[in-house]
Amino acid sequence: NNTTNSKWKKMTISLNYEQTSNNFNKFNTSGINTNGIDSYFLSYAQGLPLDEISAFEGESITQAYSEIGTYFGYANQQAFLGFESFIIEPEDIDNPSNSSYYSNVNNAINNGYYQDYYFKSRGYNSKVNANIAFQYGDNLFLGANLNLHSIDYDQSTYLLESNNTVGEGTGVYVSDIGFENNLSVLGEGVSVQLGAIAKVSDVLRLGLTYDSPTWYTITEETSQFLNTTRYEVNEFETLIIDQTLNPNIINVFQDYKIQTPSKITGSGALVFKKVGLLSFDYSIKDYSSIKFRPSNDPHFIEQNSRISNTPVSYT
């Protein structure tokens, strides 16, 4: 500042790019699980009418999966995959209003299922930061940041389950299941930071920082693939049938917004000339302020209600 009598002495402006996290990951696990993948499909199907989770006559898997997702939602799509693959069976297949189901998966490995699970992800979280800082007089320093956040994330999982057994008597028995799920997430967000440091004396420094919530807008897309091997046993023969359900549909969900918690930090330091310093920080972060929107979405109403009971963090 060239004005002789002005107390504003210095100003700095900067622009930075930071990759805040790297989401590249890959792993595989295998072993015996006491819970089979059939319980996943059963949990979605129970209570749903059969005619809301099945294809109409002459309707393709792709058409049915798309229409069910559009009119009834994600839960019905999962139940549809379970039913069409014979993993689950209605108690009364001739009743369109049937809402009770059972599993065609035979558990014969001593109360367990052999499973291979594959996980792969890629992507990053990044931040562009614009900063401006001032010095006022000799003892006060002020700063502000504007942060633009980006999310780019892809995830793929594949669960392979096998029991290689056939139950007693006639019927349908699913012995092998391969279930793939893909998720793509794109997001943009904005936040601000405000800070001040005061030189109270030659020894004492005090600081105050405010981190605003980050306001994100998130877009999610999913796709699924299911293949099974089943035994159809009757009085005369046993048929082994391999079936693939690939809807070739990308589910594009409505954009939603999420607000992360803000944080206030107070700090202090005692400076002992060239000998050293003693500093402390105290932060308050209210996790109950996390919000999902649109707030009238039934799922978000439940999530926001749970989050509202989260305690405030003091560190």
Summary of predicted features, one role per range:
Residues 3-314:
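Outer-membrane beta-barrel porins/channels
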